[in-house]
Amino acid sequence: LRSKQHEFNGVESLKRVFGSAQGKQNVPAKFVYLNDIDSEPVTADGFLTWYDARERHPTRSEYRMYFPTTSVSEKAVKGDLLVIGRRPDGSVLVVVAQGDSTVASQVRWLFGAQNFDGTGYLIRENPETEQDRIAFASRAILEAIGVDVETSQDAMLEDMLRRFHGAFPSTREFSSYARSTLTGVHHGDNGDGVLMAWMEREESLFRTLERHLIADRLVAGFGHDVDAFIAFSLSVQNRRKSRVGLALENHLEHLFLQRGVRHSRTGVTENRSKPDFLFPGVQQYHDFAFDAKRLTVLGVKSTCKDRWRQVLAEADRVEQKHLLTLESAISSNQTDEMRAKKLQLVLPAQLHRTFLPAQQAWLATIE
C-alpha cells in the first residue's frame, strides 16, 4: 500500500473502474483508515490522479494512479486491506483497513470478498444489487467507513413526536415502543429472528426521530457559539453509541422475561463488577452452596473491538463465560483468542454467515 513513488500501477482491473485516461485526471477522493483500536476512523480529503505514463507512445500504455501523502497513507503498511470505491457522483472513497483486523474482515464481507487472497485486484461491480447482505450489519460497517445510510419510518414520526413530546425518551421506553410497532413479531417466535427484528425496528425509528429533532436544533442555530455546536455534535454521537448497547440489553431482558428465564440484570459481583446478565440470578451467584456449574454469565456488547475482555473479569465463579454481540465478521485472530480465554461468542443466527466457515461451527445462537 505504501510506496515512495505514491503510485499504484494501473493494471486492467483499475482501467475497468477509471477508464482510459486522456491526460491527467484528478479525481476527488476521501481517504479512510480503520483499525480495531481507535474508536473513530482516520480520514483525509484529497485527490487521486489517474494518467497514462506512456501517453505519447504510439503502441504502449502504462496507466498509473498517484495518491498524495495524507494521515491515512502514513498509517498504511504492507498487508493492509485496500478498497477503492467509485461513488455515483464520480468521486472516490479509498478505505484502508488494518491487515487481519476485525474491521478488515467486515469490509471484506460487505463487498463479497471473503475468499479474496489479496493478490492483485478484485473488482465488484454494482455491489448494491446483491441482496444477500444483512441490513443491520451492513449499515454499521458502511457508517464506520463514512458512508451515511438513510433508514426511516416517516409514517411513524407524528406518533413519536406526540407520544414523546418532541424529545428523546429513555432507552427503555423507546425499546418498548419499538416492539409495540411490530405486531407480527411474537416473543415465542425464533429468538434470533425476534431480536434482530426488534433491533432493526428500533434503529429505523430512532434515526427517524433523531433526524427530525436534529434538524429543528440546526434551524434554531448556534449563532457564534462554536463550543455549543461542538457540544451538540458530541451529544449526538454519544447518544447513538450508548443507545444501541442499551437497546440490545432491553430487548434481551424482555425476551427473557416473556419466556420465563430467571436472571439478574447488572447484579453486583466481585470488585463491584456488574455483568449484564447472570443466570439464574445474583442471589444464587453469591450463595456458595449453589453449584457454580449451574451459573451462567452473559455479557452484552453491540460491538466488541477489544472491550470483550471486560467480560472475563466480571464473574469469578463462572469459568466459561458468554458474550452476545451484533458485530459481524469478527476476525479469526479475535475469535481464536476468545476461545483460548474460555469466552463463548453468541450471535443471532443471521449473522453467522458473515464469519468464515471455520469459525461458524463454534458460534452459538440465542435460540
PLM region spans:
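Interdomain/boundary linker segments immediately adjacent to catalytic/signaling cores
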Residues: 157-246
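Long, contiguous, compositionally biased segments that the model treats as domain-scale units
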Residues: 1-95
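Catalytic core segments in nucleotide and nucleic-acid processing enzymes
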Residues: 250-253, 257-258, 263-367
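Glycine- and charge-enriched low-complexity intrinsically disordered segments
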Residues: 114-167
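Short, glycine/acidic-rich beta->alpha junctions
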Residues: 74, 205, 215, 225, ...
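Accessory beta->alpha helical hairpin/"wing" motif in late/C-terminal subdomains of nucleic-acid enzymes
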Residues: 90-105, 203-216
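Charged, structured surface patches that assemble and position nucleic-acid processing machinery
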Residues: 44-60, 76-92, 99, 103, ...
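Acidic-basic catalytic patches of nuclease active cores, encompassing PD-(D/E)XK
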Residues: 2-8, 224-273
